[in-house]
């Protein structure tokens, strides 16, 4: 039986980089699992330490829901693509682990499944965690540095003829040295057509793909309207969504209506006045609001590509972006910590906003406490609190 062709017929028309092979399969007992840092439909991501080398890694479990299905195609696609890509802002897979199923009978061989893990460098934070953590403040030079690195990574991906198709805050990671890593290539695909060029619009757009990609809250309007010959512009919308997330200090821009494909829906944008620039100018400044408007342009043909965005004045006006190594060390913050951070933020807000009693009432209460502490409750206090006891 031949293995599945994850790139369809792309090898005939697109230059594909050779895949670096894994030297060998590791074993799970070679690692000390520390804690869970992520969870989703794919399985669980755990922080672990290599017992021999001592370095921290992330173990991503690949769930296979049925032994009859074989190796998950999304996982195979992600691993294959990541082995082809080599860029400082793209997460690397350093190895694989396969845990054999525990079989006691021949029937178990059919029903039981082995478990695969990918081994990647440990990333101390993702942007959902950083945005939700009340103890973390991402200032303008820091966010410019993060955004610049994100755009450099996306530009590299697009120049290699790939669509990521799931750019969102949870898939943008930060290592302890301040280097951004783009992760989760399970939805990535090779695209056909021209590459993105400065001032020339997006790349691709020559083949049909499913429109059911990109997490819905980050999904661009062309996908909501059912477009199938989409371009690299779908990834750029996700960059703009992240920028609004930072501006609001939240992990998402809010749910958008999932439009039907009826023709009347296409007139919605023609009857509404665009307010994005005026709404975000106080938060991002003139150049930031202008960049955001270029990233969130409704027409994908006019939307900025990564090269255009990197050339924008936002990155050359003060305050300028700092270097990755200048980003201060943050508390470990991941998407899985989001609910804990929300509770912490709510608790902090409640403590800081407890209504204060009126001064006269507070003084009366203080005098009451002083009388009680006197022992017999009869001797009034002296000094500033020696006022008429109007509380009797």
Model-derived features with residue positions:
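Glycine-rich ATP phosphate-binding loop
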Residues: 44-64
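Catalytic-loop of the protein kinase fold
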Residues: 158-175
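Conserved HxN/HPN-centered segment at the entrance to the catalytic loop
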Residues: 86-97, 106
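A conserved loop-to-beta-strand element in the N-lobe of protein kinase catalytic cores
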Residues: 101-121, 128-129
